[in-house]
């Protein structure tokens, strides 16, 4: 049987997620392969505005539209990841989906500060990661549900609506879910 990888899909935390850090989250999976998986939480605001973050990095950002930085995950919370539309043209960019990239280099932050060449974007501090077969085990135990990623879910919806919207992509109203997902 061929293994199915989940790159460019989203993990949805079930209502009874025991891990407080991941409770009520939607995670965009930027990479999933035979070595493991990495992703960014796309619905947990950090309380930091993009302008504030850029100014802290000595990047003048007076013209940046109000936009909140996300708490991307528990690992390396000091590291920034920019999930954005477009092609991987920045110094440290990788394509993770059709017209979707992750960039970690400062040049994209300069472009964001000057409203140059960056379409829709989310800046996240930190990321989530799973070792080989760890995510598969968590999914088989019912620790995560999976939905397709789309630009609306990633970029357009207010953060506090993304968890419910991810469930709706599955045709499910989460209010009706049992705390025993996968254990009928």
Curated annotation (Swiss-Prot):
Protein name in the entry: UPF0301 protein ACIAD0353
Family recorded in the similarity comment: Belongs to the UPF0301 (AlgH) family.
Gene3D superfamilies in UniProt: VC0467-like
InterPro entries: AlgH-like (IPR003774)
Organism: Acinetobacter baylyi (strain ATCC 33305 / BD413 / ADP1)
Listed PANTHER family: UNCHARACTERIZED PROTEIN YQGE, UPF0301 PROTEIN YQGE
HAMAP family from the UniProt entry: UPF0301 (MF_00758)
GO CC terms in record: cytosol
Pfam families reported for this sequence: DUF179 (PF02622)
């Amino acid at each position: 049987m061929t293994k199915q990888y989940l790159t460019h899909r989203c993990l949805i935390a079930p209502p009874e997620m025991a891990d407080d850090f991941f409770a009520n989250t939607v995670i965009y999976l930027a990479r999933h392969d035979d070595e493991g998986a990495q992703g960014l939480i796309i619905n947990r605001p950090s309380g930091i505005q993009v302008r504030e973050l850029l100014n802290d990095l000595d990047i003048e950002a007076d013209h940046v539209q109000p936009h909140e930085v996300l708490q991307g995950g528990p690992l390396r919370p000091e590291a920034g990841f920019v999930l954005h539309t477009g092609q991987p043209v920045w110094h440290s960019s990788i394509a993770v989906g059709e017209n979707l990239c992750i960039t970690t280099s400062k040049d994209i932050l300069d472009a964001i500060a000057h409203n140059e060449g960056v379409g829709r974007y989310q800046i996240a501090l930190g990321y989530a990661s799973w070792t080989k077969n760890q995510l598969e085990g968590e999914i088989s135990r019912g620790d995560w549900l999976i939905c397709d990623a789309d630009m609306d879910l990633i970029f357009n919806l207010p953060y506090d609506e993304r968890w419910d919207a991810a469930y709706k992509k599955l045709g499910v109203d989460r209010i009706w879910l049992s705390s025993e997902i996968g254990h009928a």
